[in-house]
Amino acid sequence: MYITKIVIQGFKSYKDYTVIEPLSPHHNVIVGRNGSGKSNFFAAIRFVLSDAYTHLSREERQALLHEGPGATVMSAYVEVTFANADNRFPTGKSEVVLRRTIGLKKDEYSLDKKTVSKTEVINLLESAGFSRSNPYYIVPQGRVTSLTNAKDSERLELLKEVAGTQIYENRRAESNKIMDETIQKSEKIDELLQYIEERLRELEEEKNDLAVYHKKDNERRCLEYAIYSREHDEINSVLDALEQDRIAALERNDDDSGAFIQREERIERIKAEITELNHSLELLRVEKQQNDEDYTNIMKSKVALELQSSQLSRQIEFSKKDESSKLNILSELESKISEKENELSEILPKYNAIVSEADDLNKRIMLLKNQKQSLLDKQSRTSQFTTKKERDEWIRNQLLQINRNINSTKENSDYLKTEYDEMENELKAKLSRKKEIEISLESQGDRMSQLLANITSINERKENLTDKRKSLWREEAKLKSSIENVKDDLSRSEKALGTTMDRNTSNGIRAVKDIAERLKLEGYYGPLCELFKVDNRFKVAVEATAGNSLFHIVVDNDETATQILDVIYKENAGRVTFMPLNKLRPKAVTYPDASDALPLIQYLEFDPKFDAAIKQVFSKTIVCPSIETASQYARSHQLNGITLSGDRSDKKGALTAGYRDYRNSRLDAIKNVKTYQIKFSDLQESLEKCRSEIESFDQKITACLDDLQKAQLSLKQFERDHIPLKDELVTITGETTDLQESMHHKSRMLELVVLELHTLEQQANDLKSELSSEMDELDPKDVEALKSLSGQIENLSHEFDAIIKERAHIEARKTALEYELNTNLYLRRNPLKAEIGSDNRIDESELNSVKRSLLKYENKLQIIKSSSSGLEEQMQRINSEISDKRNELESLEELQHEVATRIEQDAKINERNAAKRSLLLARKKECNEKIKSLGVLPEEAFIKYVSTSSNAIVKKLHKINEALKDYGSVNKKAYEQFNNFTKQRDSLLARREELRRSQESISELTTVLDQRKDEAIERTFKQVAKSFSEIFVKLVPAGRGELVMNRRSELSQSIEQDISMDIDTPSQKSSIDNYTGISIRVSFNSKDDEQLNINQLSGGQKSLCALTLIFAIQRCDPAPFNILDECDANLDAQYRSAIAAMVKEMSKTSQFICTTFRPEMVKVADNFYGVMFNHKVSTVESISKEEAMAFVEG
């Protein structure tokens, strides 16, 4: 085992966290300047190993804490880690960590991070080989010097300490102390025995007087027993009578209470029913009032519609008469039009044929005339011109003129054709428009019907929506009335609940709910009373058990409770008690396995997540049939017992019973408040839903009104558009006729232009033909042709005139017929056709709509009448029910008053009886105590005075008491004292014998301890002396050294003799008291020269001898590790190497940690550490051998 790591923080100069690792299991050297903290490092190790700093005061602990600039250090610790591969520490671990921590108010140890006591640490170190009797495994500065300057007697004490004689001395001192105490106890026992013997002799004399006293005293006790017994029996009889009265009263009270509760529940139900009936009656009144208002409004509307229907009927009747007249006129017109159209249809073929024939004749006549004129011109030019040249010149001029006329005629023909085509297109457009107007006028009736039907449909939809909205208005009024009623009920219930608790609690509960809603706390569950349900049979028991705990607020954890409490304190909102579920730890309860003790909690219904809160309040309560049974179980099972009537016996023995006002039930009040809150919330939700529907119907009705307005505007627009169409038809009809006439005229003009063009072309051809001929007289053919042409022209002219006359006659009739039709008959017929039926359709449609509305109103009125009749019947029935229930309520309340008075009277009687019973029980207890005070009575006491009167007993008791006065000074405890003293004497004799044997055992133990101490000192001296000689030879090969035990001479105690004790010769047997000291004798130059005493040596030689003695002690009692603080400081140069070599040799089996300023120790070390000091803070770092050598040599 060895130290592997040391951690220091806050200890002396080591302020910061300092780790020294890894430490070699052999030789470790620490170097550093003076004052850097090397000694503090060793002090830290001693601090942990309890070699020093065992009992520290506050000031001493303060001195060990680091003091320097910066923050104040309030605690410090040193931690040492041991390699435990050899299991010298019996922990079963390969590594052991020991830490000691100090502060201003603490000083504690920890082993492997577990707190342990100082005694456990000391025992652990001793089990690993750290002996308290040998502190030389740690050698601090100054110890070598003190050992060097020590006297022989001090070295002897050191040897005793190493040998462990202190343990023997402690045990011997303890034995001597016990021996002294034993002697003192024996002496005291002897004194007590002497006193007891004297007292026994005195008591022997007092026993005779006591016998006479006992005889008379027994008589007295018998008489007193007779008196007390009779009084006890009388009290029991009275108590039995009172108990019977109490049981009878309780049974009567239970019956009355049960009936009272049932009647009270019935009263509450009747009140609730009356309230509900009043609510229903109020709703019926509101509905009846609404029905009356609806009836009045519908009647007003019905009267208005009836007036409108009458007006419309008259209008339709008048319209029908007017329409009949118009139909007759239309019929006559249609007849005339048909006649004229038939006549015109007969004339038109003749007219067209004769026009065609006249045109053909006219064309033929014109051609013949042109031919004739051409021949005559040709004949006249013979006389007109003298030469052919003049003629040709004239012909050419005529041709030019004719060509100009032809071109002009063609242009005129094209212009006429263009005008004709334009007129034809215009005619087609007007005819098309005329047809459209006629079709439109024909379809106006259907369109009018559609518009009227649409308006009627919209009105019906609006009326249906209005009716539904009215129903919703009625429903809204009912809901408002119900909400007001429920709000009143809720207010009354809250007031009733408020009377069951103080104002602060009531305010607090309301505030907590509001705060939880504001903060949106999901962990708020509400008061305990709202988290469970219970059967009405156990309601009283639950209230009596929970008390004010019913109003405790249940939350999920203490954080939620803290949040709410902060707001409550800030707003001063009341007082509440919280039950955080995460902090509740209800204990498991074992219930009795019996049918008359049932756990109250099993009759509660609740969410499992509230199990802890419910158990916290109700788990320790059982329901019992009577208070007596409850009391028995309360005592036997440490549970709270309760009856169904609320009588309670808790586990501490307290009883709670008596009259209870069942009308002020907290659970009922809570239930009512919760019920009305739910009703209020439901009604509010229904009201919001109803208002939302009303708003929706308002929007729909508004949309219907918009649609109706649009439909009415469409109808008006249609009516406005109807008149212009009629006017336009008349106008188009006239324009069409005029246009047809113009076209006919244009056509005639075009025919004439074409004929003229043909004539001009013919003339041009004739002139061209004449231009190519000679200028001669007409040939015979031409003359013959001229004659023939004249005759044909005359014949055709006569025929043409006849045809023209006929055509003129036909054309005049045709024109007259067309004019009659277009300007008269058609114009009169079309408006009539449009007018007939249109007004009637409008009026009839409106009349039908009015009749439908009247029918609806009739139905509504019938429904309202029926509903009002039903409502009146319901109201009468409800009024009757209310009257019956009020009568029943009055009778029940009267009976309740009587029963309550009787219960209260019974309660007062019970209270008086209870007070009387308490007095009797006190007297009974007093009698029992007096009887007990009589002690054990003789057998005759129970029968001797049974038949004796009380007066005789009192007289005898008086005589006996007078006789006993003569024995007032007798020792009444003589027998008892005699027996007690006898027992004490026997006990003291046995104790004295026990002390004698103990004294002998202690004497033997003291002798053995003295012998073992002598043997331990002699054995240790031999071992240390031998090791000293061996080690000295190794350190000083040329010399020798030895330890010499000094003892007193047997003849003279004052003369010291030096007796050399050779380790090879047997030690002389002598007492340890003859030892006076240990001296050191050495020779540094020769093994044979006379040895010198240590006082004769130089300082360096003394230090070497002291170190040799330390090494000898360490070899004799080796430790797992050794700590040397500058042990070579005072050595001469020639011995430092020897000491370093010795340390190196011993470090093979034991770890060494040394501080030094000398290079010899550094040269043989394994690990090196440097201590630095900066700003009053020490640190330790691992360094190389070269750095260590450089430091000690520099």
UniProtKB/Swiss-Prot annotation:
GO terms for biological process: cell division; chromatin looping; homologous chromosome orientation in meiotic metaphase I; mitotic sister chromatid cohesion. The modification N6-acetyllysine is found at residues 105-106. Involved in chromosome cohesion during cell cycle and in DNA repair. Central component of cohesin complex. The cohesin complex is required for the cohesion of sister chromatids after DNA replication. The cohesin complex apparently forms a large proteinaceous ring within which sister chromatids can be trapped. At anaphase, the complex is cleaved and dissociates from chromatin, allowing sister chromatids to segregate. Belongs to the SMC family. SMC3 subfamily. This is Structural maintenance of chromosomes protein 3. It comes from Schizosaccharomyces pombe (strain 972 / ATCC 24843). Its main location: nucleus. CDD domains: ABC_SMC3_euk (cd03272). Keywords: Acetylation, ATP-binding, Cell cycle, Cell division, Chromosome, Coiled coil, Mitosis, Nucleotide-binding, Nucleus. It is found in: Nucleus; Chromosome. It comes from the Eukaryota. Acetylation at Lys-105 and Lys-106 by ECO1 is important for genome stability and S phase sister chromatid cohesion. Residues 522-634 form the SMC hinge domain.
